């Protein structure tokens, strides 16, 4: 088993502009009716090193209902036709956008794409008239650059949870 300290972070305002992508032929594409196989494949590719397990443990129908909810938006980061990352914006709670998942596949770390992806998700999350709070969850198992980036953009911790989980990937 592993223990992790999970934080919920929130921010209430933003005055940033959209960043330029650091790599040519790379785009963020919004997907509608995301196939389960596509999401799970990308989720595993991104989350394996960080013990992302919650979506693997729930029933397929629950994940599909989440992904295809009219208030949940799935975005893929595509480079030269290949998915290399993703993020999900969850607007199911009134006046709140939660960046519920965000990450890059292993071979795409250290290229400036994480900052680009998060800043874009951050700005897209605010890009509606009815949002007054943006949240993101992180934990001690996430990439070491995640928390400092969130704090640099103005996020502040609002809650902490301690979880003890069985390892899924053998980390």
Predicted regions and their residues:
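Acyl-donor-binding surface of acyltransferase catalytic domains
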Residues: 4-8, 12-27, 32
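A conserved beta-strand-loop-helix scaffold within acyl/acetyltransferase catalytic domains
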Residues: 58, 78-79, 84-96, 101-102
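A short helix-loop-beta-strand connector motif used in the catalytic cores of GNAT acetyltransferases and
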Residues: 50-51, 65-76
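Conserved beta-strand-loop-alpha-helix junction that forms the acyl-donor binding cleft
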Residues: 135-146, 163
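A short, internal acetyl-CoA/4′-phosphopantetheine-binding micro-motif in the GNAT/acyltransferase core
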Residues: 102-110, 140
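Short amphipathic alpha-helix that is part of the acyltransferase structural core
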Residues: 21-55
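Conserved acetyl-CoA-binding loop-helix of GNAT-fold acetyltransferases
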Residues: 110-125, 148, 152
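Single conserved hydrophobic/aromatic residue that forms the stacking wall/gate
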Residues: 1-7, 11, 162-171
